[in-house]
């Protein structure tokens, strides 16, 4: 699954190899609390080189593979949803400055509704303050690649991404 997602990302980005190699460190299957497995996609900062639309492609492919392999959806806990909201808000406020900033409620909707886990490796020295030491989130530091995919990929390109997913 991981190799297929990375290969498709190379094709989509027309050979910008930093995006699939460094921006998508790995994909794995992780357990939900009910025992089902879900697709867990790890992003890093270099995913930015893919562009906002292409950065979401791994989520579409991961969801497609999830369905083919009869895997479960990612079911985040309430704490994980709040962690996404806090972490991406810190990223939007303290790491990058954008004209449009997603609200905490928008971030919660995305975190709760994504069928695959948008995860990531730590890319910033900043740490989150409230929702720390969660078992399925490997770090307390801000994960820039995850935040990029949520804000610039899902948040800004949702309609375009949905049209791809339906095809």
What annotation goes with each model-predicted range?
Residues 1-167:
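Extended, Lys/Arg-rich, non-catalytic nucleic-acid recognition/anchoring regions
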């Amino acid at each position: 699954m991981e190799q297929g997602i990375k290969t498709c990302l190379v094709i989509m980005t027309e050979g910008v190899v930093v995006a699939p190699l460094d921006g998508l460190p790995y994909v794995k299957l992780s357990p939900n609390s009910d025992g089902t497995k879900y697709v867990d996609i790890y992003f890093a900062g270099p995913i930015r080189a893919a562009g906002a639309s292409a950065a979401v492609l791994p989520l579409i492919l991961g969801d497609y593979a999830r369905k083919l392999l009869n895997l479960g959806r990612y079911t985040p806990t309430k704490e994980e949803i709040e962690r996404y909201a806090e972490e991406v808000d810190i990223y939007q406020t303290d790491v990058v400055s954008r004209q449009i900033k997603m609200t905490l409620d928008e971030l919660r909707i995305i975190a709760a509704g994504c069928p695959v886990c948008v995860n990531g490796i730590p890319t910033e020295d900043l740490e989150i303050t409230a929702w720390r030491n969660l078992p399925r989130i490997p770090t307390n530091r801000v994960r820039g690649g995850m935040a990029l995919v949520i804000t610039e990929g899902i948040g800004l390109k949702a309609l375009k991404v949905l049209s791809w997913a339906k095809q």
